[in-house]
Amino acid sequence: MPHTAVALRSFVTDMRYKIDHDFHIHSFISSCSHDPEQTSERILRYAEENGFSQICLTDHFWDESVEGASNWYSKQNYAHIAAALPLPKSDRVEFLFGAETEMNKNLVLGISKKRFDDFGFVVIPTTHLHMKLNISEEDGATPEGRAKVWVSRLDGLLDMDLPFGKIGIAHLSATCIAKEREDHLRVLELLPERELERLFAKAAEKGVGIELNRGDIEAAEGAEEIVMRPFKIAKYQGCKFYLGSDAHSTAALDAAVGRFDWAVSYLDLKETDKFHISK
């Protein structure tokens, strides 16, 4: 019996990370989606066709009770995204209602503590540095300034008193870190190794999910070591990972699973590396 138990534990530990979910998906309700076919029904079909057990709708959201929204975000309040409810049902897929909120340059988070109760999962990006809302003109002027902000924003988020068991940190290697690819890669190169180790040890302790984002994975082509470095360090520090297509269109949905598969192989992820949403 002891040998059987050891063998079973070894099997579970060595089991390849299963691609069975997508926790970052936008519908046409998000203002930056321009695909009328990107409906909840189409998203559910994507999940069923790929054998997923869980998905989450995460349209852009800024809580109307929190000051500091941009004009673009202020229109995407709770009533706006709740138009998606009720979500379609499936016997095979749990379809969660979530949101992608924002954090401005003053580290004001666009969701109140009370509002978390209305969502099954909340995606929080720290790398939307293409938005004036999130970075000063001075910091945004150089890759060095952007690298400093990359660190301080993630640090600031992790210092907050939040229900991290139902939060994912989105696209940490996103191309929106900088406009030009050369600058984007330079920012990622400038992130200090020790700071990354410290931040991801902190993230692991908090129990927050780290997103493997389809867009980040696409951006890794030809620059794998640079773009995937934060995730390699996150894995080493004990972080747990979830998958997010960040799809705003049906074409992006269709491309997601292949990208996820590449990232799982590149990072050699096992089931024990998987983030599970806690209520």
Language model: regions and residue ranges:
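Charged catalytic cores and adjacent phosphate/nucleic-acid-binding surfaces used
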Residues: 3-28, 184-279
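Generic structural signal for hydrophobic
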Residues: 43-47, 114, 157-160, 203, ...
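A metal-dependent hydrolase metal-coordination microenvironment
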Residues: 16-152, 252-254
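Flexible glycine/acidic-rich beta-alpha junction loops that bind and position SAM and/or redox cofactors
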Residues: 65-67, 171-173, 177, 250-251, ...
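Short, flexible, glycine/charge-rich loop motifs used to bind or transfer phosphoryl groups or to couple energy/partner
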Residues: 10-12, 85-86, 111-113, 157-160, ...
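Domain-core and long-helix interface of multi-subunit machines
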Residues: 29-33, 124-130, 134-237
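Short loop/turn motifs at secondary-structure junctions
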Residues: 51-53, 118, 163-168, 268-270
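Short, glycine/serine-rich, charged loops/turns that create anion-binding
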Residues: 62, 102, 173, 217, ...
